């Protein structure tokens, strides 16, 4: 298959996955089944590409050689974001103090890595690869951030937060191409955002009906 066509198809399937998130997670409330299928499906695709086209894995950002340099670049932003979440949570009295945050902090980075793979690596990364002259990075980052925000409709705080985060993620990824650091960061920031700003408990939302 033509390489350009392949990248376009990947973008299209990533967008369809985002639409599926709205339908199955937000409308039908099939959170755990949808997350499980997405992780299994896309995880299998990543493993297949790793076996047959290992260079693509590096291109997608599954690499550790620049781990520390990327971590140093995102650390100030992470500290600023966490401080902002806590201030907003204290002002709005929206902080949830519950042990549920512990398992979410442990497992949400896996979902964060997959989200970053779909939105940042496949959409932003492929769009950059298709841009022969590499002159549209700003537009690519904006489009990707807009998509990431729309996926979180209708939650205004979540849409605003993910849009700003994606602007930063997109900028870093197009410079460094490391999905591990961005995915783990997104998982931790996302978990803290739910429990501080949104006053929501994703652990209960996803697992409660299966544990009761």
Where are these regions (language model features)?
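Short, aromatic-rich membrane-interface segments at the entry and exit
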Residues: 28-37, 96-101, 156-163
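Interfacial transmembrane-helix boundary/kink motif in multi-pass membrane proteins
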Residues: 2-14, 35, 55-82, 99-108, ...
């Amino acid at each position: 298959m033509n390489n350009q066509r392949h990248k376009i198809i990947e973008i299209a399937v990533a967008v369809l996955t985002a639409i599926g998130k709205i339908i199955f997670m937000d409308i039908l409330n099939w959170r755990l089944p949808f997350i499980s299928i997405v992780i299994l499906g896309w995880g299998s695709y990543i493993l297949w590409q790793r076996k047959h086209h290992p260079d693509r894995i590096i291109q997608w950002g599954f690499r550790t050689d620049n781990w520390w340099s990327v971590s140093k670049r995102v650390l100030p932003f992470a500290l600023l974001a966490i401080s902002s979440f806590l201030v907003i949570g204290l002002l709005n009295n929206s902080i949830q103090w519950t042990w549920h945050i512990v398992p979410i902090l442990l497992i949400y980075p896996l979902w964060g890595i997959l989200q970053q793979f779909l939105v940042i690596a496949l959409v932003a990364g492929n769009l950059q690869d298709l841009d022969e002259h590499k002159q549209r990075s700003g537009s690519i980052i904006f489009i990707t951030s807009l998509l990431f925000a729309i996926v979180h409709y209708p939650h205004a705080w979540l849409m605003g937060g993910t849009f700003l985060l994606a602007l930063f993620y997109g900028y870093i990824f197009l410079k460094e191409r490391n999905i591990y650091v961005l995915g783990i960061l997104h998982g931790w920031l996302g978990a803290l955002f739910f429990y501080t700003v949104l006053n929501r408990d994703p652990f209960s939302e996803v697992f409660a009906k299966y544990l009761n």
